[in-house]
Curated annotation (Swiss-Prot):
<dbReference type="GO" id="GO:0005737">
    <property type="term" value="C:cytoplasm"/>
</dbReference>
<keyword id="KW-0010">Activator</keyword>
<comment type="similarity">
    <text>Belongs to the pacC/RIM101 family.</text>
</comment>
<keyword id="KW-0805">Transcription regulation</keyword>
<keyword id="KW-0677">Repeat</keyword>
<dbReference type="GO" id="GO:0005634">
    <property type="term" value="C:nucleus"/>
</dbReference>
<dbReference type="InterPro" id="IPR050806">
    <property type="entry name" value="pacC/RIM101"/>
</dbReference>
<dbReference type="InterPro" id="IPR013087">
    <property type="entry name" value="Znf_C2H2_type"/>
</dbReference>
<keyword id="KW-0678">Repressor</keyword>
<feature type="region of interest" description="Disordered">
    <location>
        <begin position="385"/>
        <end position="422"/>
    </location>
</feature>
<feature type="compositionally biased region" description="Low complexity">
    <location>
        <begin position="389"/>
        <end position="410"/>
    </location>
</feature>
<keyword id="KW-0862">Zinc</keyword>
<dbReference type="GO" id="GO:0008270">
    <property type="term" value="F:zinc ion binding"/>
</dbReference>
<keyword id="KW-0804">Transcription</keyword>
<feature type="zinc finger region" description="C2H2-type 2">
    <location>
        <begin position="189"/>
        <end position="213"/>
    </location>
</feature>
<keyword id="KW-0963">Cytoplasm</keyword>
<keyword id="KW-0238">DNA-binding</keyword>
Length: 584
């Protein structure tokens, strides 16, 4: 493939590079054609002594080049669809004995060809390249599929074309500079975005309308991670999760506006929140007098927030989870709140409770694992020898109490298993199993041989124990001379005083069904925890959206306005404030 490239008529030499003496002028390809046309690489030689603003060109003739003029190269300058050969270079002297003609494969190819489809605008980029490079010029057409930059957002407001990399910056630019404020005398309530002609009566309505033009979705659902432009949209989305939990959202019923005199006092209980202690405070009382009725009696969201929530701490507990499950679905509108304090308190409470429960989610499975109380001895014991004397190896005590048959239970705290008891090793005698004339040598990591049979008694008394060794984790067996015979097991069972009911009770204690019942109980607890966690997230999102809606309602409150003069007010024309642009 061949093609036409563009080169400027004049290129000023403004700096010198001492390491690399040449700059490659990378041309932009215009038309690709199978016919051989002018193509190649052009180098600017700055190694020679030149005057200021002088142009010295050196052209490297490549095999694709069709011009064969002696010591002269010619570019075809293309303008307005016409081909006119223009001499852009001067005569040059080859630096070596290699002739320029020897690099040409097709000496008789015409220099100008007619191509009707040619662009009229051209670009040129300058790139550094090694002077010894002999490769032909590659296509410099930009590939949009590689290294695609981030999507640039352009402000389409009237006579404004500023670019932004983030939707938040564009939205802030629209609200501050184009919509303005009443106190700054530049409030604009008519949308001028592209062809939009929407009009609003309040500033918060206009800022809410701008979210239609800006891809801004700051409100995310904690359950499914979907994002929305407005808190009202998120509150409507919460109805889906309420139905998934088996809760029917109440029908929308428009109530009196916040602060209205027509608020029904029977719909909520008036509480003085100045007397209620802060959430999480040390002096916060417990809600014990409500405990008997909380298990079954449902409660509305507004009543629970105002009456019961101040008596809880935002930490997960079974009692709090049971009461949260009894809260009915919140309404999708603000009703029953005279001030913002309960809304702010509910937002803080459910946010902290959700954070507290989120830390426990990874530990749910480990928390409800079935762990038996009895910890047996390990199967594989690696016995290491320690320097014990024969006097301290086994101790007898006449006043020692009988061996306890009860197995100590382990108490699990913080959802972690208690560590295993320490393992005590077999006492070793100093007599090795080697020849008496050979001195044994043992390395530090080598397992030493067991003591000889003559050093340990074969018959051990019944109550001789090692005081340092746990009874339920013995590393060796002990024997007694007072053992009972097990020849007639049936006679011993029938002769005993144990009844059939006691035997059945003993068998039920070792039945595996208890383990399955415990696992089912733990699974149900895990399901209850997850259901409570989802409900808490829904209540948290609802409280946040309610608070943001109130913020939007109070955003357009009357602001102090400077009274202008009468003469100036007649000729006053509200214009947008602009900032000077700095060109670098």
């Amino acid at each position: 493939m061949y093609g036409i490239f563009y080169a400027p008529e004049k290129l000023q030499i403004r700096r010198k590079d001492r390491e690399k003496k040449k700059y490659l002028v990378s041309h932009t390809w215009i038309v690709k054609t199978p016919l051989p046309l002018i193509s190649g690489q052009s180098y600017i030689n700055i190694n020679k002594k030149t005057k200021k603003n002088s142009n010295i060109w050196e052209f490297r003739i490549l095999p694709e080049t069709s011009n064969t003029s002696l010591n002269t190269a010619m570019h075809t300058m293309v303008k307005n669809g016409q081909q006119t050969p223009v001499l852009l270079g001067s005569k040059i002297e080859p630096r070596d004995s290699t002739s320029i003609k020897s690099l040409v494969n097709e000496p008789n190819t015409p220099t100008d060809m007619y191509h009707p489809k040619i662009k009229t605008e051209y670009d040129m980029t300058i790139k550094k390249e090694s002077p010894t490079s002999t490769e032909p010029l590659k296509e410099t057409t930009k590939d949009t599929s590689k290294d695609t930059p981030k999507e640039t957002l352009i402000c389409k407001w009237s006579h404004c074309y500023r670019e932004f990399q983030q939707a938040e910056l564009l939205y802030h630019h629209l609200c501050q500079e184009h919509v303005g404020r009443k106190s700054q005398k530049n409030l604009q309530l008519k949308c001028q975005w592209d062809n939009c002609t929407s009009k609003t009566e309040k500033r918060d309505h206009m800022t809410s309308h701008l979210r239609v033009h800006v891809p801004l979705k700051p409100f995310a659902c904690s359950t499914c991670s979907k994002r929305f432009k407005r808190p009202q949209d998120l509150k409507k989305h919460l109805k889906i999760h309420l139905s998934d939990l088996g809760i029917d959202a109440p029908k929308k019923k428009r109530g009196p506006k916040v602060g209205s005199k027509r608020v029904n006092s029977k719909s909520f209980h008036k509480v003085s929140y100045d007397q209620v202690p802060a959430i999480g405070s040390a002096s916060q009382p417990r809600f014990n007098h409500y405990a008997p009725m909380q298990a079954s009696q449902p409660v509305s969201y507004e009543h629970w927030v105002q009456m019961e929530m101040p008596h809880y701490t935002p930490v997960y507990s079974p009692a709090l989870a049971e009461r949260v499950q009894a809260i009915s679905a919140p309404t999708l509108y603000v009703q029953g709140f005279e001030n913002r304090e309960p809304v702010v308190a509910a937002t803080q409470f459910f946010t902290r409770l959700s954070t507290n429960m989120a830390y426990q989610v990874p530990n749910i499975q480990n928390q409800h694992l079935y762990v038996p109380n009895y910890v047996g001895r390990p199967d594989n014991l690696y016995l290491h020898s320690t320097a014990h004397s024969s006097d301290n190896s086994v101790k007898t005590s006449s006043s020692s109490s009988p061996i306890e048959t009860s197995v100590p239970t382990t108490h699990h705290t913080d959802n972690k298993r208690s560590p295993l008891p320490a393992i005590h090793y077999v006492p070793q005698s100093n007599i090795p199993l080697v020849h008496s004339h050979v001195q044994p040598h043992y390395s530090a990591n080598e397992v030493r041989p067991l003591p000889s049979l003559s050093s340990i008694s074969m018959v051990t008394p019944k109550y001789v124990i090692d005081q340092n060794l746990p009874k339920y984790n013995r590393t060796y067996d002990t024997f007694s001379t007072n053992q009972k015979s097990c020849a007639d097991e049936e006679e011993e069972i029938y002769d005993s005083d144990v009844s059939d009911d006691e035997i059945s009770d003993m068998m039920n204690k070792v039945n595996l069904s208890d383990k399955n019942a415990n696992e089912e109980e733990y699974d149900s607890d895990e399901e209850d925890f997850i259901a409570t966690f989802k409900r808490v997230n829904i209540l948290k999102d609802y409280a946040i959206c309610t608070l943001l809606e109130e913020e939007y309602d109070t955003e357009d409150e009357p602001e102090p306005v400077l009274q202008p003069n009468v003469a100036e007010s007649k000729s006053f024309d509200a214009h947008l404030m602009t900032f000077p642009e700095i060109l670098i």
